[in-house]
Amino acid sequence: MLTNTQAGRRIRAVLKLDRVDIPSLQPITLRALTGRQVAVRTDAAQTCYSSVGQVLLPSATAPQTVSVVGHGGVGVVVAVGPQVVSTRVGDRVIVNFHGACGWCYSCLLARQDQCLNFSGGPPVPTADTTDGKPVFSGSSGMAEVMVVSQEKCVPVFTDVSSVELSMLACVGNSGLGLAMTRCPVQPGSDVVVFGCGPVGLSAVQGAKLKGAAQIIAVEPIAYRRELALKLGADAVVDPNQYTTRTPVQGFSGVNGDFFKDALVDRLREMCKQHTDRTFVGGGRVGPDHVIEAAGGDAYGGVITRPSAGTGPDPTGMTVLSQVWQLCSQVGTAVSCSIGYPPDAKVEIPANQWADGQKQFWGGTCGGTNPRRDGPRYVRLIETGRLNMKALASRTYPLADTVEAYRVAMNRTVVATIVTPNG
């Protein structure tokens, strides 16, 4: 067991040494735990697609400091700092990408997904390299031991496998939150989900759990469309079959189209109500809810070409516009992707901004409160109503972490999992 008196323990971790470095497996020496820090022996950690660029390509957004790769994971607590109260040695925990302090402005407004202290405080080094450089770990799971703040740790009391649970640390957590928290899906709703990676497929399941009458999944890769149908989608669409898109000239009306878009037209047709009579509940144009989890294929100025296939626009910008246009006049649109370049503009007609009644929510982290929702999601797995096993496609040892990210980038499987102590 690691304790503060045993600080100095040598472990292995996948480190990114600088912004142009490809991460590699390195020995590091742990520092003593302080404050609310928790040491967790890592059993499984999923590869978040948003980290692909930082891991495999030179990245202007990667930290300048030496850092451990990863976005959370699952493991067993082996030591706690002197101020830790929410977990204890021996607990099995999900280490979330973001924490929730419970005290900041966002948390007090029940927006724990936007916690202002989501890292548990200012970054501090948790280990040192063999040549004495400080190592920062955040919520990084690609190490034999994670050192994280207690705010990121959610104790779970279950026999569900660590590989399945690891999907709840980041991507699955976000997708479920998109459909079950940020997006007010009601029984009988029509829901369109863009993207069938681990986030989108989790959103499909979340919409099903909320009672959606029709779920349409939009995905360019064939095997992912097939999996979406198995996990709850009622229909699937290949966006590469509907690529015609031309601007509409002139005033488009409060809820009018600003593009003539073949994909939007197709999805509207699939969501068409049985009647257009507005005095008997008809007249809706488009689905009740649109969830975007498509992402893009551009990182740091590099356009990647996933070997499994790609959509019509590798920058991910077109789909952001389609999400808004497709949404019905009083519907809800939720998006968790960032187009490329990050400062690119998504244009919305001014009259729709003021007079339209569409609702839009940014969906990063899915609106999830980890301590509240994590145990709920675990219970849904236990009862067979939520399938994370189907998303956790392939496991890798810690030494093959970079390859796990490469496979994730190529999208040949839904999600890859690293088992540092497996």
Q: Which ranges hold each PLM region?
A:
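C-terminal hydrophobic helical "lid"/dimerization subdomain
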Residues: M1-R9, S252, R277-T278, G311, ...
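Short N-terminal strand-loop motif that marks the start
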Residues: M1-V74, S140, E144-V148, N421-G422
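Glycine-rich beta-strand-centered segment in the early N-terminal region that forms part
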Residues: T29-T47, P58-L108, D113, P155-V160
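NAD(P)H dinucleotide-binding glycine-rich loop of Rossmann-like/cofactor-binding domains
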Residues: C101-F194
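Adenosine-nucleotide cofactor-binding segment
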Residues: V193-C196, K208-Q322
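N-terminal Rossmann-fold NAD(P) dinucleotide-binding loop
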Residues: G200-L201
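Rossmann-fold NAD(P)-binding glycine/threonine-rich loop
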Residues: M317-L326, I338-Q357, G374-R376
